[in-house]
Design a protein with these regions (language model features):
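Alpha-helical multi-pass membrane segments and their bilayer interfacial helix-loop junctions
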Residues: 1-405
Length: 405
């Protein structure tokens, strides 16, 4: 939470005698935004310094003798690591982590530059995997979120580079990222790290399906396994962060099925997985997911699985069923938001409902309505829905606050 939020909500706590005025001032004092801003400066400075060094070396690289090049790489990397450790021992954690991060960047840059110096030809991303592994080890050594994010970025970009440049998927990179950084995510229970891990994992699953040219539905098996893991996390903010990206992926897939599915032209071989194996895998994940939800007393959230219903295997009515799934899921998110009095969830559910409505509008009217009229009516519908739902949200939240007095 931020200082601004505490300053806004704190007086109400004092008024209800939940805390005293002195306690309120002490709580506000804990959220000094100035200190957070100053703490970020070394990290930003490390990024700029790293870019400056890389650009300088790249501009003059060809004019530097080979032995001096190798010495520069070793000296710069060692200096950054040594400086980082020194500042960390002095208690200047931000600056120490910033220099350690520069050491990690220097290590990766050194791998590339040494390969160029000695004309080494790479046929896979083993060197990048080693770089990511080094970042993972540093993450555990210093328990740093910044080093975690850099390592996660290295693995994600390396995987993309492998599929794009070498046309092969690196299972080793995925395994090291999923096990190493995944366990760190599980330990820290940090919302930001969990969001980033979930996004990277889903993207890498997409790369796997595309690279192997597998039926697209296989994508949802590892993705929903990630969702299922979120049901066994006690901290709900972390669980939501782990599950939101898989649900967004399923929601987008349902939209695509509504807008673009055509039985006459669609290639089922590119989409449909083997029914027995795929549906069996989903049912198994659903069972484990529901068990976790019941343990956490969140059984009603099993309704989120409606987006994964395998309507695509039916012979007719596929678009209508996926459209209904979109609306039901949107209503569910709205309903849970109102029940929990969670403003973010209400806003998100509102956005999903508006999006579902526009998908239905586009599906039903695009082919036969004049295009200018289509956009005019669509805009009016969007504005009307937005006004109505926002008005309804404010009314319900106001009633909820009134009931607390």
């Amino acid at each position: 939470m931020s200082r601004k939020w505490v300053e806004k909500e704190g007086p109400r706590w004092v008024e209800k005698e939940i805390i005293t005025r002195e306690q309120y001032e002490q709580i506000v004092g804990l959220y000094d935004d100035g200190k957070h801003a100053i703490g970020i400066l070394p990290l930003l400075g490390s990024v700029l310094l790293g870019l400056g060094i890389l650009s300088f070396v790249a501009a003059n690289w060809q004019d530097i003798p080979q032995l001096l090049r190798l010495s520069m790489i070793i000296v710069i990397m060692t200096a950054f690591y040594t400086g980082g450790e020194w500042f960390l021992r002095k208690g200047q954690d931000k600056l120490g982590i910033a220099l350690t991060a520069l050491g990690l960047v220097s290590f990766g840059g050194g791998i590339v530059l040494v390969g160029q110096m000695f004309h080494l030809v790479a046929y896979d991303i083993t060197s990048f995997t080693v770089w990511g592994l080094a970042g993972t080890l540093l993450t555990y050594m210093y328990r740093s979120r910044f080093l975690y994010l850099i390592s996660l970025l290295i693995f994600t970009v390396a995987q993309w580079y492998s599929t794009e440049q070498f046309h092969q998927y690196s299972y080793a990179a995925l395994a090291i990222m999923a096990i190493g950084l995944g366990y760190f995510t599980w330990q820290r229970q940090n919302t930001l790290l969990t969001w980033c891990f979930s996004l990277s994992f889903v993207l890498q699953c997409m790369m796997l399906i595309v690279d192997k040219d597998w039926a697209f539905l296989w994508f949802f098996i590892p993705v929903m396994a990630l969702y299922t893991a979120g049901d066994w996390i006690k901290d709900r903010s972390t669980g939501y962060a782990l599950q939101t990206v898989p649900l967004i992926a399923a929601y987008i897939f349902a939209i695509v099925m509504v807008l673009m599915w055509d039985e006459r032209t669609s290639s089922l071989d590119k989409l449909l997985a083997m029914p027995a194996a795929y549906i069996g895998g989903l049912v198994l994940l659903l069972a484990v997911s529901v068990a976790g939800k019941l343990k956490q007393q969140r059984g009603s959230s099993a309704f989120e699985w409606i987006l994964l219903a395998p309507f695509v295997y039916l012979s007719a009515g596929i678009e209508v069923l996926y459209l209904l799934a979109l609306f039901f899921f949107s209503f569910y998110v709205l309903w849970r938001g109102y029940i929990e009095q969670w403003r973010f969830k209400i806003n998100f559910g509102t956005l999903l409902f508006i999006c579902s409505t526009m998908v239905a509008y586009g599906k039903l009217t695009w082919d036969f309505m004049d295009k200018s009229l289509f956009f005019i009516l669509g805009g009016l519908l969007l504005l009307t829905l937005s006004w109505f739902l926002n008005r309804r949200k404010k009314q319900i939240l106001a009633d909820a606050k009134g009931g607390e007095h």
